[in-house]
Structures are given as structure tokens and as C-alpha cells.
Curated annotation (Swiss-Prot):
Keywords of this entry: Viral genome ejection through host cell envelope, Viral penetration into host cytoplasm, Virus entry into host cell
Any one GO biological process: symbiont entry into host cell
Family: To phage P22 gp16.
Species annotation: Acyrthosiphon pisum secondary endosymbiont phage 1 (Bacteriophage APSE-1)
The protein's name: Putative DNA transfer protein p35
Free-text function comment from the UniProt entry: Component of the phage injection machinery. Required for injection of the phage DNA into the host.
Source species, domain of life: Viruses
Gene designation: 35
Length: 625
């Protein structure tokens, strides 16, 4: 919003409180006497002109205040907005023509040629106030419909035509200052307080870490990456810069090329997924567990020796079920009945049985009951389980009595692991799939476990995998992502996001270890920070892919003015996206946005951009040659 007081117009951000506006205006006029005194001292001692004072980096307001006192007649002309506006409007077409002519001459001289066009005749003097137009009205003639900040930037080309020194440097400096005062820099800088805190002139640690990580991967974040545009205008300016001649398109293209390579390299690191590797890892690991349990059983068996052990529980269980079976008469399962009678005879023989023999009887009992049947008879399950459990109890009691209760507990665990290691570690369904996959070499069976949407399945097999198997499971997930994304960073981030959300994140947290998570998160952060490269209006490495015949035609039709405007706009955006400007913005002191104090801090920061922009302009022009 604009506020006029004592003949001077002040510009404040929309939404600024009335109290803050009043305070800022009071401070401004209260400081005029002090400032004028300081400037007067400069003048008395050195007799400096206003132009010379500008080189001392004295604020413009101070210069104008001093100028008013020294030249009251001229000052009254400057403060007459009608006179200034009239002069400015009359000079617009001549400023524009001079800007185009100077750009054409600059390009000609850059390739060793001479000046092609002379100075443009002006029937009316330019405005006395150097900021009368602020570049905005001129910019509208260069690129109609661009928007206020865009008009100000490209309008600076015309203003540069009337300044001493190098035309390109003047245009860049003017555009940078205009842009900073009301446009892209201001809007972007206001994002500093929203997520990036710059205290004591230093870049916030989290922002510095982001930039360091990205640059270590070969991706240089641009200003709009670290301070994303906050509204439609600034987003449009960013996009326009990517498509403009000599703009930021080449940088975005280089960014995207590096990002694609990062994704491709990451996906390639895990190699191809082979389901057999997972099967072999599981079976090998589980077999080693079974073998370890077998060694514990053998050790205890050897300690028990050949002394007879009690079989009381087993015999009692057989005596309980035999009468029930015998009552069935001819309907009884004869094989089950005979197996039980034979087992009782073995257990009650004279001299008894030792520990190893009782253990062997228990192992053979279930096989004898099943016989040649493909499926274990349902009616025999309860009886078989009852007798087996009784025999196990006799074995445990004998170990506890002969050795120790601790040895008995060790024996029970080893015995359970030996008999049920697959079912215990996995579960019956997974064990069945694993066994079938082992026999039939069908990867689909193990894939149903590896790609299961149930986190419990992954958690169950994970401890049973060795490092090779775990790498294979990670490769399985990365391979599936690779099938979808190719080398697209945007699709890669989408798939990683989906994986993190699957089963509440439990699968991701299980499959990817802390080290792998750290690597993936770092890559994801870099891709996220520079995601504008995915959707940018990218041009070729020369930055001129959009210089189509229509643009060339428009340039000739307007005496090179439209082309000059676009080149100037592109140069300004390249400088805005440069590292010096990016870092300067990130160092902007942390002040509440929308307040006069904040605007003053922003204006002070703008002063720093003048030499930065000039140097950056020179460097980047050499890059495009």
C-alpha cells in the first residue's frame, strides 16, 4: 500500500498495521535533520556531488534530503509528481528504443564488431527524480502483461541506457535493485522467517546442511530452491526466468541431469533381485539353527548315558486311550491300536529303556501311526499328541533328575527348535511356501512373502535372513521401485513416500537399516529441495531454445526491444538464482515480516546485492560465451 506524507510517498507491504506505518514515517522525518547534517559535513569537507555521494553507499533518502537543501528550485521540480510523471511518460518510447539499441551494440561489440546504432534523439528531458518511473511503466512497453515486478526488472534496461558505464552491468544492477525493492527478492526474503532462521547474519544450520549435502552430490540448489516462491507472481517470475533467453533454463537442465543420474546410480547400487537368494538365505540360516539344536540334544543324550529312565507318564497315557479304542471293535483303526500296544511293550520291557531309546521311540511313533496315509488321520491326532507329550515329559523329568533343571530346560528348547524351527521362526504358511519354493524353484511363492503387505510377514523372516538375504530383500523393493520410476526423480520420491506409508511404515523401518535410511533420506531431501527441476520450463544448455522465429520476428519489428527485454529479464533471473544472492538472502536477519523494521533490513540487504549482481553478471555472461 502507498501512503503520502509531507509530499513524500512511502510504500508498505499490504497488511501492515497503521501503528507500524505511523511509527516508520515518524522515524523517517525525525532522522532527516541528523542525516542532512552528516551529508552536509561530507559536502563541506569534500564538495561532493550527489552522484559522487551515491558511490559512498549513502542511502538514497539521505542524498535526496541533502539535494533538496542545496537545490531548492530543482527540489520543488522533483517533488512535483505531475511534472515528473509527464517527463517520464514522454521519454518511455525513447528509453525503450535506446535500451534495444544499446543491447544490440553490446552484443555486437562482444563478438568483435563495432557500434551498429547511434544514440536516440530525445525531444524532452528525462525526469529529474531517478526513481520517478521505478522501471514499472517502461517494463510494460517491453513485455506487456508480465506483472509489476517483471515490468520493473525489464524496465531497468531502458533506465540503463541513460547511465554511464557498461550497459549490461547497469541494466543488471538496475533490475536487481528494482526487483529487490518491490518484487521477487522481497517476496522470497519474506520466506526467510517461514522455515529458515537467519540469526546474527549466519545461514541457519538446517539450510546450510541442505546446501552442503546437495552440493556434495553435485546438485547446486538455486535461490528459488532454498526460498520457494510464495505466490503466483513470484512463481511466474521463476518460471519465466527458466524460459527466457540467457535465463536460468540451462542451470535447471543441468540440475535435472544430475538428479536423474543420482536416482539411476542409487537404483543400480542394489543390483538385480533374485528370489533364490532369499530362499537360500532362509533355508541355510534355518538349517544352521536346526543343526545347532541337534548338537544340544546330542550333547545331553551323551551325558544321560545308558541308564534306564522312567516312562510312567507315557505308559499311563497309553493305558488311558487303549480301552477306548478297543471298545470300537471292528470299527477301530487297527494300525493305531497295534502301534500303541507295541509301544507299550517296548516301554515296559524288562530292564527298561535308556534316554536315547525313549527319544527314538517318540520320533518313530508318529510315523508309525500315519503309516502309508498321505494325510495324518484326524481321529488319531488327539491320541498321538497325548502320548507324544507324555513321552516328552518323561524325557524332561529324567534330564532334570539326572543332570539339572537348567539342563532340562535347555533340552526342551533345543528339542522344540529341532522339530519346529521352520514353523516357529516363520509360521506355517510361510514355511509351507518356503519349502515349496525350495523344492519347485518357484520364485512367486517366496515373493508373496517378500512383497507381503503384512508387516508381520517381513518382521518374521527378517531375523532368519543373513546379510546376503537382507540385501536381496532390499534389492527386491528397490527393483520394484525402479520398474515404476525409470530415472525420474519425481516418480522416485513418490514411490519412496508410498513405501514409507505402507503398513504404517513398519515394512520400510524393517527393510532399511539406519545406514540405508540415512543415505535414502539424504537423497530424498536433495531431490525434494530441487524438485522445481522436474517441472521447470527447461531450455537447452545455451539457454536459447525458446528463441523461436516469433521472437526473432518480434525483435526485428520492435527494433530489438522485445528481445532486449527478454534477455535482460533472463539475466536478472540468473543473478537472482546465483549462489551469492541465495546466500545473502539466507543471511537476512530474522525479523518479523511485514513490519517497517523488516523492510529496512531488506533494503539494507539490497545494498549488498549491487556489487554481487555486477560480479555475477560478468561471470555468467562469460559462461554463456
Amino acid at each position: 500500500m502507498k501512503v503520502t506524507a509531507k509530499g513524500k510517498t512511502f510504500v508498505f507491504p499490504d497488511g501492515t498495521r497503521i501503528d507500524d506505518i505511523g511509527e516508520a514515517i515518524d522515524e523517517y522525518f525525525a532522522g532527516q535533520s541528523t542525516q542532512s547534517g552528516e551529508i552536509a559535513n561530507h559536502h563541506d569537507n569534500n564538495a561532493l556531488s550527489s552522484a559522487q555521494m551515491a558511490n559512498l553507499d549513502i542511502p538514497t533518502d539521505e542524498i535526496l534530503a541533502y539535494h533538496d537543501k542545496q537545490n531548492p528550485h530543482e527540489s520543488s521540480q522533483i517533488q512535483d509528481p505531475f511534472t515528473e510523471a509527464g517527463r517520464g511518460l514522454v521519454n518511455i518510447p525513447f528509453d525503450v528504443l535506446q535500451g534495444g539499441a544499446n543491447l544490440i551494440n553490446a552484443l555486437s561489440q562482444a563478438v568483435g564488431g563495432g557500434r551498429l546504432l547511434g544514440d536516440i534523439y530525445r525531444p524532452v528531458d528525462r525526469p529529474a527524480d531517478p526513481y520517478a518511473l521505478a522501471g514499472e511503466t517502461v517494463g510494460d512497453y517491453l513485455i506487456p502483461g508480465l506483472g509489476a515486478a517483471g515490468k520493473m526488472m525489464v524496465g531497468s534496461l531502458a533506465d540503463a541506457s541513460n547511465q554511464r558505464g557498461d550497459f549490461a552491468q547497469n541494466a543488471a544492477t538496475n533490475a536487481g535493485v528494482n526487483l529487490a525493492a518491490q518484487g521477487l527478492l522481497s517476496a522470497a526474503a519474506k520466506g526467510v522467517g517461514k522455515g529458515i532462521t537467519a540469526l546474527k547474519g549466519e545461514i541457519a544450520p538446517e539450510a546450510a546442511q541442505k546446501m552442503m549435502t546437495a552440493e556434495s552430490m553435485g546438485v547446486a540448489p538455486m535461490t528459488s530452491d532454498m526460498l520457494p516462491p510464495q505466490n503466483a507472481l513470484t512463481r511466474g517470475l521463476t518460471q519465466g526466468g527458466e524460459g527466457a533467453l540467457l535465463g536460468t533454463g540451462a542451470r535447471r537442465a543441468a540440475q535435472q541431469t544430475t538428479r536423474r543420474k543420482l536416482v539411476s546410480d542409487y537404483l543400480d547400487r542394489f543390483g538385480e533381485y533374485n528370489p533364490d537368494t532369499v530362499v537360500k538365505s532362509l533355508t541355510s540360516n534355518l538349517k544352521s539353527r536346526k543343526d545347532a539344536a541337534g548338537r544340544v540334544i546330542d550333547d545331553i543324550t551323551q551325558k544321560m548315558g545308558v541308564n534306564p529312565v522312567e516312562t510312567t507318564h507315557a505308559v499311563n497315557a497309553i493305558d488311558t486311550v487303549l480301552p477306548r479304542l478297543e471298545k470300537l471293535g471292528t470299527s477301530v483303526d487297527q494300525n493305531l491300536l497295534n502301534t500303541l500296544r507295541n509301544l507299550k511293550g517296548e516301554l515296559t520291557q524288562q530292564g527298561g529303556v535308556d534316554f536315547d531309546l525313549l527319544k527314538q521311540h517318540r520320533t518313530a511313533f508318529r510315523s508309525n501311526v500315519q503309516g502309508d496315509a498321505l494325510v495324518f488321520p484326524n481321529h488319531a491326532k488327539a491320541i498321538t499328541n497325548r502320548v507324544e507329550n507324555a513321552m516328552t515329559k518323561d524325557l524332561r523329568n529324567s534330564v532334570s533328575k539326572s543332570l539339572s533343571p537348567q539342563e532340562a530346560a535347555t533340552y526342551l528348547k533345543a528339542n522344540s527348535d529341532y522339530e519346529n524351527v521352520y514353523n516357529k521362526v516363520l509360521n506355517k504358511r510361510i514355511a509351507r511356501n518356503l519349502n515349496k519354493a525350495t523344492r519347485e524353484a518357484t520364485p512367486e511363492l517366496i515373493n508373496s512373502v517378500v512383497y507381503s503387505r503384512n508387516a508381520s510377514d517381513i518382521k518374521r523372516i527378517w531375523p532368519a535372513l543373513d546379510n546376503t538375504g537382507k540385501d536381496a530383500v532390499r534389492a527386491a523393493y528397490i527393483a520394484k521401485i525402479a520398474e515404476t520410476v525409470g530415472d525420474s526423480p519425481a516418480k522416485f520420491m513418490t514411490q519412496i513416500s508410498k513405501l514409507k506409508k505402507q503398513a504404517g511404515g513398519e515394512i520400510y523401518n524393517t527393510v532399511f537399516s539406519a545406514r540405508h535410511m540415512k543415505e535414502l533420506e539424504a537423497l530424498n531431501d536433495v531431490l525434494q529441495t530441487t524438485q522445481r527441476a522436474d517441472t521447470a520450463n527447461i531450455v537447452t544448455q545455451t539457454g536459447q531454445a525458446l528463441a523461436n522465429p516469433l521472437r526473432i520476428g518480434a525483435a526485428f519489428g520492435s527494433g530489438g526491444v522485445s528481445l532486449a527485454g527478454e534477455v535482460g529479464f533472463g539475466m536478472v533471473m540468473r543473478m537472482y538464482e546465483s549462489r551469492p544472492v541465495r546466500n545473502a538472502l539466507l543471511r537476512l536477519a530474522n525479523k518479523k515480516t511485514g513490519t517497517p523494521a523488516y523492510e529496512r533490513a531488506l533494503n539494507n540487504a539490497v545494498k549488498l546485492f549491487r556489487p554481487i549482481i555486477a560480479a555475477s553478471s560478468s561471470q555468467q555472461q562469460s559462461e554463456t560465451q
